[in-house]
Amino acid sequence: SKYRKVYDSQGQRMSGPYIITSSNPNELPDILANQKIADTIQVLHKDSKSYRVYSIMNDEKLKKLIIDELGLQENQVSVNYTKLFIPEFF
């Protein structure tokens, strides 16, 4: 992926997956419109209520970046680790 060079050069791996949600489900912020945020994530899935992403940041740093860049209050957005279900194929 295009992120491979970034996290290899930093000695880090992608973290996550994380679910990013808004406290108001009708007002999910457009995090991809912000280049600083977009450069730190890889979107796995987006719907009207959440984003599922991998990030080169941990959940706390990613949440702080989103809050700072989009001018949100801490209670307006959440970033939570989640497990992805990947079925086994035989």
Spans of model-derived segments:
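Short, surface-exposed beta-strand/loop "edge" segments at domain boundaries and coil↔beta transitions
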Residues: 26-32, 59-61, 85-88
